[in-house]
Amino acid sequence: MAGAYDDRDGVIWMDGELVNWRDAKVHILTHGLHYGSSVFEGERAYNGKIFKSREHSERLLKSGEYMDIPIPYSVDEIEAAKEEVLTASGLQDAYVRAVCWRGSGDDMGVASERNPVRMAVAAWEWGAYYGDAKFKGAKLDIAKWKRPSPETIPCFAKAAGLYMICTMSKHAAEAKGCSDAMMLDYRGYVAEATGANLFFVKDGEVHTPTPD
């Protein structure tokens, strides 16, 4: 076991520089902690190369635009940060998490324009998401909560606040002995699992729900 995520060896890229893992901290009055003003990407590196890395960085910036979180880094700068973390960590096969959020500042109400936008990149070893179930077959619950209509949320943003119903749904699924929960959209169609996409093969073609 690697231990708790706040008590590990290594480094994390934070606001433009590498810091010791245990020193990568934020203030308790960070806006993103209270109001969900945060966007992120979850990526996988194989043999030292991040799968579709640039596309992830582009989506991170786009998520920031959707959420009115102007990320102060370019795609190239985000790419460089991820490579720096992987190299410094000595990892070849890893999970890479890039996250941006509204930090602590002059605002502590709902509005946060005067608060700085901060960013961090961390990487660590993380095995198969479903463990042995990846090979034996994962048992899925049907989530109580549905993915909201795009008229009610910025559904194209990978935003932290949009994952709360996913957390609740996975807790309920695990309590029933399931690996995860399948979530339906607001129309009752299959959308995704709580932290993974769903695919199936029919007549030699791969199908997955449309991103709406």
Protein language model features and the residues they cover:
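Helix-start/capping segments and mature chain N-termini
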Residues: 1-84, 110-212
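Short, acidic/charged, Gly/Pro-enriched secondary-structure junctions
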Residues: 78-107, 124
